Amino acid sequence: MDEQLTRTMLFDLYGDLLTKKQREYFHLHYNEDLSLSEIAESEGISRQGVWDNIRRAEEALRRTEEKIGLLERYNAQKAAAAAMETEAEELVALTEGRAGEIAEDLLRRIQELKHGI
C-alpha cells in the first residue's frame, strides 16, 4: 500500500484521537493539498510549527495502529476476500447443476462481502 493511502486510511480510522490542530493541519496538508507555507500563513504560525504538528499527528496515528491494528486487520480481510473470490470463480467454472448454483451463490456472497470491506 502506498504511503499516501496508508496515511489517509490511518487518519480516517484514528483521526478523532488527534488534537484539533493536528487534525486540521493534517487534513489541510494531505487532503486539501495545501503547502506548509499556505497553512502557516492562514494560521499565523511558522512553517516549522505546522510541520511539527503534522509530524506529531503522523507519529500518533502510527503508534495507535501499532497498538490497535485496525488497518492491518482490514488489509488482511481484504486479501482473504480477494483470494476467496478467485477460488469461488474457479469453482463456478468447474461445476454444473446444483453444485454450480451453490458455487455461484457463494461467489456472489463473497463479492458482496468484499465490496462491503
What are the functions of these language-model segments?
Residues 46-47:
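Helix-turn-helix DNA-binding motif, specifically the short coil turn and the N-cap/start of the second
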Residues 36:
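Helix-turn-helix DNA-binding elements, focusing on the entry/boundary residues of the two helices
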Residues 20-31:
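Short amphipathic alpha helix immediately N-terminal
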Residues 58-65:
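C-terminal flanking helix
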Residues 68-94:
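Intrinsically disordered, low-complexity basic tails/linkers immediately adjacent to helix-turn-helix/homeobox/MYB/SANT
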Residues 9-18:
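Short amphipathic alpha-helical boundary/capping segments
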Residues 39-40, 50:
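Hydrophobic positions on the alpha-helical face of helix-turn-helix-like DNA-binding modules
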